[in-house]
UniProtKB/Swiss-Prot annotation:
Protein name: 2-(3-amino-3-carboxypropyl)histidine synthase subunit 1
Pathway(s) it belongs to: Protein modification; peptidyl-diphthamide biosynthesis
Organism of this sequence: Candida albicans (strain SC5314 / ATCC MYA-2876) (Yeast)
Substrates-to-products reaction catalysed: L-histidyl-[translation elongation factor 2] + S-adenosyl-L-methionine = 2-[(3S)-amino-3-carboxypropyl]-L-histidyl-[translation elongation factor 2] + S-methyl-5'-thioadenosine + H(+)
Residues binding [4Fe-4S] cluster: 132, 238, 367
E.C. no: 2.5.1.108
Assembly: Component of the 2-(3-amino-3-carboxypropyl)histidine synthase complex composed of DPH1, DPH2, DPH3 and a NADH-dependent reductase, predominantly CBR1.
Primary location recorded for the protein, binned into one broad class: cytoplasm
Function: Catalyzes the first step of diphthamide biosynthesis, a post-translational modification of histidine which occurs in elongation factor 2. DPH1 and DPH2 transfer a 3-amino-3-carboxypropyl (ACP) group from S-adenosyl-L-methionine (SAM) to a histidine residue, the reaction is assisted by a reduction system comprising DPH3 and a NADH-dependent reductase, predominantly CBR1.
Family statement: Belongs to the DPH1/DPH2 family. DPH1 subfamily.
Length: 426
């Protein structure tokens, strides 16, 4: 086992300052002036309590268990559970959807399901950035009657999808001892630390929390924050908890990459952020330029106030786009006398939007991080639903450097609601 890690100071990248590159129109004055996501009614479907006990003939099937050994042992693809659910529903064609990093295992899983369930399988090769990309619409158009969505949590409830859905989190076992010793080395006894990660590492987070709280040598108090309806300790790139800066002294993200961690860094700029990479076992101190991000976003909001025609984009990558949010935005924009052009796009690219010459600005109902991370690269403002409502003076952006990251919270814009952000001004 490698020695425990002291945090490495990640060098801040030297990049040109981001700025909004579009130009404000000249000589134009500013004008004065719930239900679940597209629920499909299916009276024949009963959502109720089900028995969770997988039959012994599946669990103890020697041939099946040998086939499962072809998959990595530290990745839990829940093959027994999947087979049981497919057999129960008597489905004939099953769609398998997973992020690109897991596609290497897709054909093994496909062969196992075809052999032990006597079904046809279709591996969906389009990108799957998150649970919002679950593509039950495409699966149904391919005559699938069941879809297995891997590596993401149940962001889109199973009672509103067009076909039967099974979410497989693909939890990953990691070296907990190394993580525990790393935390103990870098923090004082009794420190309160927020710990979170993607759903793959959720069991690890809760296991490490219990072990450190009961550590007789150097107890630590780990707090897995929760933004309902997400699980405790789960974070998304667009949704994270607002932490109590008076008590939480640091936050630790378990996972590779920074995308999901940045959500919490944007939402909690006052709290030091650390990242533990379970693959390289490196522990690093992470930084985010909040001021630059908020300056760029405020500039885009300010520029959009001059717009007379706005392109309202509905994301068509899986279930990224929420038609209810789109309708609310269209109504609010129209009330201000702004002409609305509705656009459907699976992926929102600068060169694509540049073709809409007569549109002054865009509002996208797809992924808020697209605007936050890449909005500066578009030649016209590209606002999130939150930013559009701020521009229309129907939501709040505080003077302090806190930007809300609650898109898929229970009252978030991603669910067709308008959240309360009045606390940002206090």
């Amino acid at each position: 086992m490698s020695p425990v890690e002291k945090p490495v100071e990640v060098e801040k990248p030297k990049v040109p300052k981001r700025r909004f590159v579009g130009k404000k129109p000249q000589n134009i004055t500013i004008k004065d002036g719930e239900q679940p996501l597209t629920k499909t009614i299916n009276p024949a479907r009963h959502i109720g309590r089900v028995m969770n006990q997988i039959p012994d003939d599946i669990l103890n099937d020697k041939e099946l268990n040998e086939a499962i050994k072809l998959l990595p042992s530290n990745y839990n693809f829940e093959i027994h559970k999947t087979i049981w659910n497919i057999r129960k529903t008597n489905c004939k064609r099953v769609a398998l959807q997973m992020p690109e990093g897991l596609l290497i295992y897709s054909l093994i899983i496909s062969d196992i399901l075809e052999q032990f369930c006597q079904v046809e399988t279709i591996v969906m090769g389009d990108v799957s950035y998150g649970a919002c990309c679950i593509d039950d619409y495409t699966a149904r158009s391919l005559d699938c009657d069941f879809i297995v969505h891997y590596a993401h949590s149940c962001l889109v409830p199973i009672d509103i999808t067009s076909i039967k859905v099974l979410y497989v989190f693909v939890t990953i076992n990691i070296d907990e001892t190394h993580l525990i010793n790393t935390i103990k080395l870098n923090f004082e006894r009794g420190t309160q630390i927020a710990i979170f990660g993607t759903i793959q590492f959720n069991p690890t987070i809760h296991s490490v929390k219990a072990k450190l709280e009961n550590d007789t040598e150097k107890p630590m108090y780990l707090i897995p924050p929760q933004t309902r309806p997400l699980s405790k300790g789960e974070v998304l790139g667009c949704t994270s908890a607002r932490l109590d800066k008076e008590h939480i002294k640091a936050m630790i993200y378990i996972g590779d990459g920074r995308f999901h961690l940045e959500s919490s860094m944007i939402h909690n700029p006052e709290i030091p952020a650390y990242r533990y990479d379970p693959y390289s076992r490196k522990f690093t101190r992470e930084y985010y330029d909040h001021k630059q991000m908020i300056d760029v976003r405020k500039d885009a909001i300010s520029t959009t106030k001059y717009a007379t025609k706005v392109g309202l984009i509905l994301g068509a990558l899986g279930r990224q786009g929420n038609p209810i949010t789109l309708d609310k935005l269209e109504k609010s924009l129209s009330e201000k006398g702004i002409q609305v052009v509705k656009i459907i796009l699976s992926e929102i690219l600068p060169q694509k939007l540049a073709m809409f010459d007569d549109v002054d600005a865009f509002v996208q109902v797809a992924c808020p991080r697209l605007s936050i991370d890449w909005g500066y690269a578009f030649n016209k403002p590209l606002l999130t639903p939150y930013e559009a409502m701020v521009m229309l003076e129907k939501d709040t952006m505080g003077d302090e450097k806190v930007y809300p990251m609650d898109y898929y919270s229970k009252d978030g814009y991603g669910r067709g609601s308008i959240p309360d952000h009045s606390h940002l001004t206090t």
